Amino acid sequence: MSCEASGKIWLNGEMVEWEEATVHVLSHVVHYGSSVFEGIRCYRNSKGSAIFRLREHVKRLFDSAKIYRMDIPYTQEQICDAIVETVRENGLEECYIRPVVFRGYGEMGVHPVNCPVDVAVAAWEWGAYLGAEALEVGVDAGVSTWRRMAPNTMPNMAKAGGNYLNSQLAKMEAVRHGYDEAIMLDYHGYISEGSGENIFLVSEGEIYTPPVSSSLLRGITRDSVIKIARTEGVTVHEEPITREMLYIADEAFFTGTAAEITPIRSVDGIEIGAGRRGPVTKLLQDEFFRIIRAETEDSFGWLTYI
């Protein structure tokens, strides 16, 4: 998905022109991947424009920064305000929002405590991450030869820029082999997640998803789906999942801020269930989008109107 210029970016407390939101080539982040970030969606509905789970995203941003010893020079509330301000300033009704915290220009090396911590918020128009038709017809995925990092090598609970080099390898491999997306295993050989999404399967009407201990990011859309499913009376199991369990599942789907709830129609060329979006996946999609579109009560308090 391309990143189209939308006007202004919030950078270290000030609104600057899109083209002026730059960093020095010797900034620490450029050389060592020392950034943490979030991906957040703003949706247009009958009541206005609403940011989905804003505070949960900002809390995770601060948690990621804490893991990497990065002291954000703003409060969570100030970052929430900056995100709302950025969307308003750019006149966007529906968009993708990217707050990012990074170590800037200061010192080189792997002990970066004296580097400044910079913060930026950008927002731009955004479509369906895995394709406009993917939400209905699904995507083809392949299990990657690249594994998710063990938790004692890289902290997967941090949404850190450097972690996504691992994801890039898996995604490029998947596309090269003719798949839309990759599925990655954890260091024990169990299913972990996609290159940028969490994963679920459905078997005999019940939902299964890997536990957080399977080297995955604790996804906010993942949490939303679990809450919706349980509210709808669907049993959800968080437990290790083997590769072959995907092959014999009735349904499977990815979740993520960008991917939303995207069905998986095949894995490694093996058709999942009927090879199309299944009834449980559709139920979850319908309830998810009903909340976003203000077609039902926001009983979870997930929408922040701007």
Swiss-Prot record:
Enzyme class: transferase
Leader sequence residues: none
GO terms for MF: L-isoleucine-2-oxoglutarate transaminase activity; L-leucine-2-oxoglutarate transaminase activity; L-valine-2-oxoglutarate transaminase activity
Cofactor(s) listed in the protein's UniProt record: pyridoxal 5'-phosphate
PROSITE patterns: AA_TRANSFER_CLASS_4
Recorded superkingdom: Archaea
Pfam family, one: Aminotran_4
Pathway assigned to this chain's UniProt record: Amino-acid biosynthesis; L-isoleucine biosynthesis; L-isoleucine from 2-oxobutanoate: step 4/4; Amino-acid biosynthesis; L-leucine biosynthesis; L-leucine from 3-methyl-2-oxobutanoate: step 4/4; Amino-acid biosynthesis; L-valine biosynthesis; L-valine from pyruvate: step 4/4
Keyword Transferase: yes
A GO CC annotation given for this chain: cytosol
EC number(s) recorded for this UniProt protein: 2.6.1.42
InterPro entries for the chain: Aminotrans_IV (IPR001544), Aminotrans_IV_CS (IPR018300), Aminotransferase-like (IPR036038), B_amino_transI (IPR005785), BCAT-like_C (IPR043132), BCAT-like_N (IPR043131), BCAT_family (IPR033939), Class-IV_PLP-Dep_Aminotrnsfr (IPR050571)
GO BP term (any one): isoleucine biosynthetic process
Keyword set, alphabetical order: Amino-acid biosynthesis, Aminotransferase, Branched-chain amino acid biosynthesis, Pyridoxal phosphate, Transferase
Catalyzed reactions per annotation: L-leucine + 2-oxoglutarate = 4-methyl-2-oxopentanoate + L-glutamate; L-isoleucine + 2-oxoglutarate = (S)-3-methyl-2-oxopentanoate + L-glutamate; L-valine + 2-oxoglutarate = 3-methyl-2-oxobutanoate + L-glutamate
Cystine pairings recorded for this chain: none
Modification type N6-(pyridoxal phosphate)lysine: residues: K159
Family: Belongs to the class-IV pyridoxal-phosphate-dependent aminotransferase family.
Main function: Acts on leucine, isoleucine and valine.
Protein's UniProt name: Putative branched-chain-amino-acid aminotransferase
Species for this entry: Methanothermobacter thermautotrophicus (strain ATCC 29096 / DSM 1053 / JCM 10044 / NBRC 100330 / Delta H) (Methanobacterium thermoautotrophicum)
